[in-house]
């Protein structure tokens, strides 16, 4: 029987941190970060990374594990996170995954072996160029749907790496990715997933407040420091919301007001995409984070069936 992990997800600024820390303290959990930006060292303010005080309240994993110059893949996250989970459980503790990166959760719950037999760098580069063009992700996903509808249905168009890999395998072998031998794999652990939500107007107001606090805490200075340390502006990490909007300001290409406007707008759009993604996931408990019994609902859901 698979060991069960708890997962707390939801859009940015929905209150995941406070609830996860309470769960961790009460139920002897160690937190595994499920955020694609908090993995990067030196990117603290713009990623809303757990503070030193918060990290002192519970053991945190998968934070500060990569340099901003690295291209950290979903597959690498899956491998490292599963290793963390196994270690946590081997020591008799609970693993609580916390974050809003849907691709990471999908990789853990529905792992898909990418296959190493067929690979061609020129084909991959060609597909990557298409993906980088306007409407490119949609175009690639449509191509995949035409030749391999089963895999296309499984993969979101934003899962560009896996869409490209599926197309690459098809072009090299002439067989749909879904029909390749031993392609699909079973999840290593069982995941009990809860997602936070709240009225959109309140969520957007919280996003505005969070960004204002980030700016007060020195977000602009953090971006400048990263650039001066040699992190290229086109590094994958610097394309994250909070950094890509502030880079033009740090380089004198735009005003602070323009940068902040773009940052707040993009963050609202991102929160909306996060909610849309999670609604596609199966077996998710939705909890209004503003309800007085939000914690009690989470606790009851996670511990159901356990001996008291």
Show where each model-derived region lies.
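Phosphate/pyrophosphate-binding catalytic cores of soluble transferases and nucleic-acid-acting enzymes
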Residues: 1-308
């Amino acid at each position: 029987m698979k060991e069960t992990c708890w997962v707390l997800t939801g859009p940015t600024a929905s209150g995941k941190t406070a609830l996860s820390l309470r769960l961790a303290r009460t139920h002897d959990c160690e937190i595994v970060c499920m955020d694609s930006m908090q993995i990067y060292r030196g990117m603290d303010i713009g990623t809303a990374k757990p503070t030193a005080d918060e990290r002192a309240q519970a053991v945190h994993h998968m934070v500060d594990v990569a340099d901003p110059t690295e291209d950290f893949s979903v597959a690498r996250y899956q491998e490292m996170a599963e290793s963390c989970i196994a270690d946590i459980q081997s020591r008799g503790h609970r693993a609580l995954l916390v974050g809003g990166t849907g691709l990471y959760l999908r990789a853990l719950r529905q792992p898909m072996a990418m296959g190493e037999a067929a690979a061609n760098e020129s084909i991959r580069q060609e597909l990557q160029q298409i993906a980088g063009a306007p409407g490119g992700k949609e175009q690639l996903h449509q191509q995949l749907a035409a030749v391999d509808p089963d895999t296309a249905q499984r993969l979101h168009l934003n899962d560009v790496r896996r869409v490209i890999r599926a197309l690459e395998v098809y072009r090299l072998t002439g067989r749909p990715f879904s029909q390749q031998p031993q392609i699909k794999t079973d999840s290593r652990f069982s995941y009990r997933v809860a997602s936070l939500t709240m009225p959109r107007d309140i969520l957007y107001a919280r996003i505005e407040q969070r960004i204002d606090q980030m700016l007060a805490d020195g977000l602009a200075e953090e971006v400048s420091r990263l650039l001066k340390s040699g992190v290229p502006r086109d590094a994958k990490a610097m394309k994250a919301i909070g950094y890509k909007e502030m880079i033009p300001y740090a380089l004198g290409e735009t005003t602070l007001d323009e940068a902040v406007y773009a940052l707040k707008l993009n963050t609202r759009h991102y929160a909306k995409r996060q909610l849309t993604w999670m609604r596609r996931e199966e077996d998710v408990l939705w909890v209004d984070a503003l309800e007085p019994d939000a914690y009690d609902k989470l606790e009851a859901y996670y511990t159901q069936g356990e001996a008291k």
